[in-house]
Design a protein with these regions (language model features):
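Long, charged N-terminal interaction/targeting segments
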Residues: 1-133, 202, 210-221
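Short, ordered beta-strand-loop transition motifs
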Residues: 112-118, 159-162, 192-196
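Short, flexible, mixed-charge glycine/proline-rich loop motifs
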Residues: 114, 136-147, 158-162
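Short cysteine-rich clusters marking metal-coordination/redox-active sites
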Residues: 149-152, 168
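Short functional micro-motifs and their immediate structural scaffolds
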Residues: 155-159, 173-176
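Cysteine-rich micro-motifs
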Residues: 162-174
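Short metal-binding segments enriched for Cys and/or His
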Residues: 173-187
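Acidic, low-complexity, intrinsically disordered interaction modules
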Residues: 186-192, 201
Length: 221
């Protein structure tokens, strides 16, 4: 997502650090989305309705069985990014933005999610608004995924050549080349506001440290 506003970086960190209590309310499986039993998936969709897979070009009928049965778009992303310490933290921070900005949860829905060039790409349909906090947070998480192993979800990664993807040192065995950990950096973007070209930078370190701390505390594999 690339529609950004002038929100400050510390807000990302503050929003992310408030999610631990909320996470406890959601009975999510301790593995990947792919292994959910039907009841668990329905619970997940109820708690995070904005991840329900809806084809925006065809229909927005949330009650149609084809959508309630097929689930979400998130089954298409690498297993490592579906681990609880990453995916649950991401979804709670996105939900927090939606709630704090007063948007209706039913008006936001996902149309696609995938790995691309070693980072996450998510497509959402959202209401037109002057405040792009949701898009800001989406961009931060899309870029942050590139600092967690696409295979197991651990932090501290190197980037493979050929098919570009992040791998931790433990998963590097099948990859040719020397393991060189990449430092977490800011993401620079250029946007247009009121016909004026504006360059902005989002610091990913606060979010990275939040997810890394949760990983260290849970270490679910």
């Amino acid at each position: 997502m690339y529609f950004l506003n002038s929100r400050t970086v510390p807000e990302f960190a503050m929003r992310a650090t408030r999610i631990s209590a909320e996470m406890a309310k959601c009975s999510l499986a301790h593995d990947t989305f792919i292994t959910y039993r039907p009841l668990e998936k329905l619970e997940l969709l109820e708690y995070f309705p904005f991840i329900k897979h809806v084809d925006a070009e065809r229909t927005t009928d949330w009650e149609h069985p084809v959508f309630s049965e097929t689930g979400t778009c998130l089954e298409c992303i690498p297993d490592g990014w579906q681990k609880p310490w990453f995916i649950e933290t991401m979804l709670m921070s996105l939900k927090s933005v939606i709630q704090e900005d007063g948007m209706a949860m039913k008006d936001i829905y996902m149309t696609g999610a995938k790995e691309k060039y070693g980072s996450l790409r998510m497509d959402f349909v959202t209401p037109v608004t002057k405040d792009h906090a949701f898009s800001d947070m989406c961009l931060a998480w899309e870029e942050l995924a590139g600092y967690f192993c696409c295979q197991c979800g651990k932090p501290h990664v190197s980037i493979s050549r050929g098919w570009i993807c992040p791998y931790c040192k433990d998963c590097w065995d099948d990859i040719n080349g020397e393991f060189k950990e990449i430092p977490v950096e800011s993401v620079s973007i250029t946007t247009w506001e009121n016909d004026e070209k504006i360059k902005r930078t989002i610091d990913l370190v606060p979010l990275y440290e939040t997810v890394e701390k949760i990983w260290e505390e849970t270490c679910v594999y």
